[in-house]
Amino acid sequence: MPVVWPTLLDLSRDECKRILRKLELEAYAGVISALRAQGDLTKEKKDLLGELSKVLSISTERHRAEVRRAVNDERLTTIAHNMSGPNSSSEWSIEGRRLVPLMPRLVPQTAFTVTANAVANAAIQHNASLPVPAETGSKEVVCYSYTSTTSTPTSTPVPSGSIATVKSPRPASPASNVVVLPSGSTVYVKSVSCSDEDEKPRKRRRTNSSSSSPVVLKEVPKAVVPVSKTITVPVSGSPKMSNIMQSIANSLPPHMSPVKITFTKPSTQTTNTTTQKVIIVTTSPSSTFVPNILSKSHNYAAVTKLVPTSVIASTTQKPPVVITASQSSLVSNSSSGSSSSTPSPIPNTVAVTAVVSSTPSVVMSTVAQGVSTSAIKMASTRLPSPKSLVSAPTQILAQFPKQHQQSPKQQLYQVQQQTQQQVAQPSPVSHQQQPQQSPLPPGIKPTIQIKQESGVKIITQQVQPSKILPKPVTATLPTSSNSPIMVVSSNGAIMTTKLVTTPTGTQATYTRPTVSPSIGRMAATPGAATYVKTTSGSIITVVPKSLATLGGKIISSNIVSGTTTKITTIPMTSKPNVIVVQKTTGKGTTIQGLPGKNVVTTLLNAGGEKTIQTVPTGAKPAILTATRPITKMIVTQPKGIGSTVQPAAKIIPTKIVYGQQGKTQVLIKPKPVTFQATVVSEQTRQLVTETLQQASRVAEAGNSSIQEGKEEPQNYTDSSSSSTESSQSSQDSQPVVHVIASRRQDWSEHEIAMETSPTIIYQDVSSESQSATSTIKALLELQQTTVKEKLESKPRQPTIDLSQMAVPIQMTQEKRHSPESPSIAVVESELVAEYITTERTDEGTEVAFPLLVSHRSQPQQPSQPQRTLLQHVAQSQTATQTSVVVKSIPASSPGAITHIMQQALSSHTAFTKHSEELGTEEGEVEEMDTLDPQTGLFYRSALTQSQSAKQQKLSQPPLEQTQLQVKTLQCFQTKQKQTIHLQADQLQHKLPQMPQLSIRHQKLTPLQQEQAQPKPDVQHTQHPMVAKDRQLPTLMAQPPQTVVQVLAVKTTQQLPKLQQAPNQPKIYVQPQTPQSQMSLPASSEKQTASQVEQPIITQGSSVTKITFEGRQPPTVTKITGGSSVPKLTSPVTSISPIQASEKTAVSDILKMSLMEAQIDTNVEHMIVDPPKKALATSMLTGEAGSLPSTHMVVAGMANSTPQQQKCRESCSSPSTVGSSLTTRKIDPPAVPATGQFMRIQNVGQKKAEESPAEIIIQAIPQYAIPCHSSSNVVVEPSGLLELNNFTSQQLDDEETAMEQDIDSSTEDGTEPSPSQSSAERS
């Protein structure tokens, strides 16, 4: 036979000697094993071994060692026992005795002894809870590990949804028991049956095949195998689940780092809805990793919940959807890039990665298999970087699709910023669809939550480890510090807050709406969500309305400027959970939350408020579509990955924030998704403010899930200055609140958090302006995809970040005329992000603006294109109503204001669309604008804009549509107090937003509509916003509406000044009353009434909102200095029905703003040139004003000294402010003369600097869209209507959220206001 291969190999003598020795030793060992298995040692065997030892050169010591090995081998002992009976080891034992007995040694004492003992004891306890090994031998684990029959490959987009659909019966009977491995093969698993499909918790045991420790798929963070990596586990309610998991883990193809799916039957019971099963899938470097993780002790009810509903979509990086549970890599797939990107590729069946580490570490992440309807956010949180996925064990993705359960409870927010960790909601979500794929936007609100009973942290698919305690159990997965962790604090992991990537930097979840991981609320609409930015930007605490709705207690956490925030949630199984978020960036700083510190008392009706409409997943990055039921999810993307992550998820609104560090974060806020707990009560807001103060450097996006299925506008907490998670969405889920906190810096590395339910993707984009531009492009794409969601996203629209407002400011800096349209654009951008559904391209632009806002310097390059985008948005939004909200950087109180602002922005957005058209014109005019170096505001020389704005305002006031929403947010840190965003929100456009506002102020709305804004003021001294909001809805009915939101930074001392401000303000508002009247004859009749009505000033913990109804120029406008309260000088057209109530409201707001200002003090660094910013703001205001219903945003940075604020901006005393407001309101007719310019004088900390400067805010004539605005309002309100039902408190909460947003942006300094941007320019 011919030789086909060489007979001699090129082996050296040494190599041959080694191989020979190996063969000899193996042969001898094999012989001893065989003889030992035969039975006891006999004389013949002993002689045979003696000869063999000579032939094979085996020494006596080796002989004895091999014998000892054989004697101690339980396998050989068992065989010998069965073959030759008992007592077959005595001779062998004698033969194997050591010649020299070992000397007894002392127990070594080292530095690690205590730790080792603790681990050993924990292992012993854990093992004691496990069945005896003999009992585990004959499990019925049918592991057809590679059967691909049931589900489509995980990489397949969620749309298929058969297997993955949560809630829906498993695709096939096999599907229910099938785990789909990344390769696409499916493993059939018998799992405990789910008691209820929908909301009943199902108990399931998961056995760990691997060692304890982080659990869940410990997919390689990079998720090399995009498709195959994810394991989708549709689990039927069979008790055999754990066995199947083990078999699956064992049978998984090696291509993934060993992926183990383990179910511990006894160890944890997970409640899942119906058929959804939770499979813990771990792809971890070592296969042993999983088993311990899943331990009996852990409760997985929450996890299961998560699993069924949420499907993990791999983050941007990798297609694989698998959520990595392992500490380092566990969220890697789902969170971080892999999850985000996966969603599109992944089929409905997404791997549910529920990894449970040893009792303490158990994390379960589930991916809801594919409910095609539900929006998939990246099913898993997207980590900014693969490592972020790995970052912390806590970051397991637990996703709850909220698809079927629409109640906020079900919706879990996955904390975006860090790891978007979902607080595992108790049954509601979990019951739903365990397999639901994150990409499923509509039905499911996928959230990933990880619960651990003892030490487990629940991690959403966000990278950053964070700890969420859903129900009793939370699972924690350690994530690499890089990646954001979901809710639970992981050891150095950063929770992904807001943006998954950004969030990765910090753990963001906390009871407050912190949505640490990206997964939370993928599809959530921005409007409802509250996000707060702290100037320090480290942490943003957001209390989503959902949380408020839940009524859960929010524990504000003190956030230290650490990358990672730890969030501890006190799970209330069904009831709202309390989550304490501690943010520790990779640095590992931890913030301890104050348990019970924040309680959300206000229930917000988020359900139905907005839903994210499913948008084709795939093309656009991070496009997440979710229906109302879906929890909001925010996906944060690493700055590089932003676009990649979002492919499967639809993200409606996008926000791009530039971190102080120069990193850009893109926040994509899906409006449609419901963010139930956007805002919390003022008390909560204040608590948040305190928290924010502590974590001034931290920005956390908080999402809270509301038990109610309603969707509320999502508030984002953006911290511009820090690499805080840019976006946060609150998801209505089980009573879980997720807060996302992340640092900007961390963000870029690993902040992709995605809330399963909402399709919100935040992208962390490079901080460069170029990245901003690219981010904007990506956002535009996303927004285009999310345009559908725009209607749904109305409630979210209100969550517009100051950063977005700031973007225009940046543009202003760039170009005199450019800034003006940017100012509108800024508002619009937020709105656009929120109204992405309506105009994808335009909204994309707006999203871009927010990016600009974050970084003043960066925006300059993109400002021009952004402006164009804004113009587009304006055009597109002409039909859509948008309100512009300016958010100040104040961190805590901002929540409500932020919400309101967002709402205002959303309304303004429509106006801005019109005003965008004007804005283009104004762009030219803006060149003529002069920047007041001291005030930092642009003086408008173009009367046309002001006139048009005035006209709009004038016409609007009669309708009471004219509302000056003056939000004074303290930018104490940034000294942006001077920055006031005067937004003459065109209520027409604002109407969509107004629904939210109206929800808050519904009571006031009728009065406002009829006449009694004064009454609203009286009613809502504290919550003037409520009245404003209601007015906005009213205004929505009538096209011309002007909402002016003035965000002023102020200190408590300035509170009185705020009231006085109106009298003293040097603001020259030249609204063209005649024009306005001409624009709206109908509104003229109401003008008188509106004039009578006093601007409503809403006081938040740190937010002061003044709403002016009637025909007021949208220029409210005082930019207050740091110490003094921002004076809200409404245009002359302002109506002053009730000074006292207004004052009271103002005072409250001022107080709140003071709190925020304190918090914002850290933000201060971001804002370099407040005066310029003020100018920019003025320009923005001018732009807004131009539209018939103009939204004027005037941002006066806090450069001015408090004194200045007091003197210039407002009267010496708060009462003056009130009177001033009144006066302005009374003066509407006078204003028309000056209609073109609004003067905002910033008197504040930088009095000397700013006092000379006067800010003229010129309203950009916006084309009145009388019908449009009303219709838009009507259309947008889908979510907003529910908002209208909200109590005023709820509205205030929204406001708080808004404020928080604003504060965040203020932190960035660029973001807060155009004036900032302007200042930067100069």
Swiss-Prot record:
Glycosylation sites: S228, S236, T271, T501, T506, S557, T1120
Ranges for region Interaction with ZMYND11: 104-108
Region (Interaction with BRCA2): 1-478
Pfam families reported for this sequence: ENT
Biased composition (Polar residues): 698-707, 1205-1223, 1312-1322
Post-translational modification: O-glycosylated during cytokinesis at sites identical or close to phosphorylation sites, this interferes with the phosphorylation status.
One record GO biological process: DNA repair
One cellular-component annotation, GO: nucleoplasm
Any one GO molecular function term: identical protein binding
Record keywords, A-Z: Chromatin regulator, DNA damage, DNA repair, Glycoprotein, Nucleus, Phosphoprotein, Repressor, Transcription, Transcription regulation
The ENT domain, residue ranges: 16-100
Documented effect of changing L106A: Abolishes interaction with ZMYND11
Predominant location: nucleus
Transferase recorded as keyword: no
Extent of Low complexity compositional bias: 148-162, 417-437, 717-734
Sites bearing Phosphothreonine, chain numbering: T207
Acidic residues bias: start-end ranges: 1291-1310
Phosphoserine sites (modified residues): S209, S213, S238, S818, S821, S1136
Keyword Nucleus tagged: yes
Chain residue ranges for the region called Disordered: 148-178, 192-215, 417-444, 698-736, 1205-1231, 1290-1322
Subcellular location: Nucleus
Other known facts: Defects in EMSY may be a cause of sporadic breast cancer and higher-grade ovarian cancers. Overexpressed through amplification almost exclusively in sporadic breast cancer (13%) and higher-grade ovarian cancer (17%). Amplification is associated with worse survival, particularly in node-negative breast cancer, suggesting that it may be of prognostic value. Was named EMSY by PubMed:14651845 because the protein sequence contains the word 'SISTER', after the first author's sister, who is a breast cancer nurse.
Purpose of the protein: Regulator which is able to repress transcription, possibly via its interaction with a multiprotein chromatin remodeling complex that modifies the chromatin. Its interaction with BRCA2 suggests that it may play a central role in the DNA repair function of BRCA2. Mediates ligand-dependent transcriptional activation by nuclear hormone receptors.
Quaternary organization: Homodimer. Interacts with the transactivation domain of BRCA2. Interacts with CBX1 (via chromoshadow domain). Interacts with ZMYND11. Does not interact with CBX3 or CBX5. Component of a nuclear receptor-mediated transcription complex composed of at least ZNF335, CCAR2 and EMSY; the complex stimulates the transcription of nuclear receptor target genes such as SOX9 and HOXA1. Within the complex interacts with CCAR2 and ZNF335.
Protein name as it appears in the record: BRCA2-interacting transcriptional repressor EMSY
